[in-house]
């Protein structure tokens, strides 16, 4: 870098002068502090005011930065309209898990103690209570037993329960339902979207624009209560859960009941929930558990593609791994590759382990970043009326008493063709942080972004003057010192030149060599080397 000339150095020193900068800076108050003249009371007051304003500004900036670092969020609720809505999945389970007419002596041998609390000596009496003959002499139980096959064979069949089905006025049937295993046994899901089936939609709200089904709960197939056990059902009817297609049902925890002898109206409203990921929230699209790997819950079905992440699915996979580690098997409604637990494993290990785990709530499952829920309002009326009882009895070849005690109607529909959008949003964005800092800067010190650039420019001038100027001055001093030494050497040679004879000289040989030691416009000193 070329060292500055005298004029450039003077200009640079003027630019780095604090008084010059204070008079030209757009920051308020500096001109009153660093103006010409000595220290006065007025200048001291201005300095105090500027320092207090600067301290207040820095405090506000620190508070705003701290608040931004806490990553607060806000929740907004918006009512939105839609031309059509996807109809939810509807899962149905009969409260009675097994039909009495389908139980065999082999079933009681394997599952009687675990499921019904029966002692082996009570099997014959229980079979008589079921209206079935006792085990024949020489009865030999099967060497193995599969709980999933028991529920698939002895559970209530939808073909027998479903008396009538209509979706938006169009007939539907058992083929529109998908078999799924839950903790309540074999259940059925309408509009599940399984196997890539197209999801049903509705363009209208209100009754008659959704699913309407008539069911026979088959109360005569309910198992007799032999002993009071922990999960003994005393009610009659079905359990219903309305949920999104992306999550498996948890009907034993989230389902509501529908009783025979009533028509239950379920008015739904779709809620689309959107959560924020860290650091503003805790949502995730995958479980924080690295072992999370959702698999189909149908123990009799073939594996299919993994469903999207959901809170219920994550908990179900977590419970399955816990039971598999504790018992070496899994319950029939759980995903995984472990074998299904035997009835004795259900009683001695799986059910107690699962209940203990649910009490501790040890599964780490964050909320999904996007999910769909359905708010419900239930109302009901008694059926059948006196006018319709005889007609229904004749139509289904049943007595009027049977119709009253076993038949129910379930009507599920959207209240209106709109949905609620519940969204989490960052409560304090970067733009708001910059806006607050800019506002505080203008309020307290009368500065802006350009003022900061002015200060940076001044600091560059100071650096160039004080730091780089120091090295330039040092280099110039070294150069001047070198020139002084050279001049002294030349002066030394000049002092020896007068001892030479300046009178007439003998002629020199032509081969002589002369060297000029010093020259000027007046004289030239020569040293002759012979």
From Swiss-Prot:
Glycans are attached at residues 176, 397. InterPro entries: ENaC, ENaC_chordates, ENaC_CS. Residues 63-440 are extracellular. The chain crosses the membrane at residues 44-62, 441-460. Inhibited by the diuretic drug amiloride. Potentiated by FMRFamide-related neuropeptides, which are induced during inflammation and modulate pain responses. Residues 298-307 have a biased composition (Low complexity). Expressed in liver, lung, kidney, testis, brain, eye and cochlea. Expressed in spiral ganglion and sensory hair cells of the organ of Corti in the cochlea (at protein level). Expressed in dorsal root ganglion innervating muscles and spinal cord. Expressed in peripheral sensory nerve terminals like nerves of the Meissner corpuscle, palisades of lanceolate nerve endings, site of mechanoreception in guard hair follicles, and Merkel cell-neurite complexes. It comes from the Eukaryota. It is a multi-pass membrane protein. Disulfide bonds join 93-187, 165-172, 283-369, 314-365, 318-363, 327-349, 329-341. A motif (GAS motif) lies at residues 446-448. It is found in: Cell membrane; Cytoplasm. The keyword Cell membrane applies. One of its GO terms (cellular component) is plasma membrane. Keywords: Cell membrane, Cytoplasm, Disulfide bond, Glycoprotein, Ion channel, Ion transport, Membrane, Phosphoprotein, Sodium, Sodium channel, Sodium transport, Transmembrane, Transmembrane helix, Transport. Residues 285-307 are annotated as: Disordered. A motif (PDZ-binding) lies at residues 527-530. Disruption phenotype: Mice lacking Asic3 have normal development, size, fertility, and respond as expected to most sensory stimuli, but develop hearing loss early in life. They display altered responses to mechanical and acid stimuli, including an increased sensitivity of mechanoreceptors detecting light touch, a reduced sensitivity of a mechanoreceptor responding to noxious pinch, a decreased sensitivity of acid- and noxious heat-sensitive nociceptors, and a reduced latency to the onset of pain responses and more pain-related behaviors, to stimuli of moderate to high intensity. GO terms for molecular function: enterobactin transmembrane transporter activity; ligand-gated sodium channel activity; monoatomic cation channel activity; pH-gated sodium channel activity. Residues 1-43, 461-530 are cytoplasmic. GO terms for biological process: detection of chemical stimulus involved in sensory perception; detection of chemical stimulus involved in sensory perception of pain; detection of mechanical stimulus involved in sensory perception; detection of mechanical stimulus involved in sensory perception of pain; detection of temperature stimulus involved in sensory perception; detection of temperature stimulus involved in sensory perception of pain; establishment of localization in cell; membrane depolarization. The PDZ-binding motif mediates the interaction with PDZ-domain containing proteins including DLG4, GOPC, MAGI1 and LIN7A. Forms voltage-independent, pH-gated heterotrimeric sodium channels that act as postsynaptic excitatory receptors in the nervous system. Upon extracellular acidification, these channels generate a biphasic current with a fast inactivating and a slow sustained phase. ASIC3 is more sensitive to protons and gates between closed, open, and desensitized states faster than other ASICs. Displays high selectivity for sodium ions but can also permit the permeation of other cations. As a neuronal acid sensor, probably contributes to mechanoreception, acid nociception, and heat nociception. Can form homotrimeric channels. Heterotrimer; forms functional heterotrimers producing channel with different properties. Forms heterotrimers with ASIC2; gives rise to a biphasic current with a sustained current which discriminates poorly between Na(+) and K(+). Interacts with STOM; inhibits ASIC3 acid-evoked current. Interacts with LIN7B (via PDZ domain); increases ASIC3 expression at the plasma membrane. Interacts with MAGI1 (via PDZ domain); probably regulates ASIC3. Interacts with GOPC (via PDZ domain); probably regulates ASIC3. This is Acid-sensing ion channel 3.
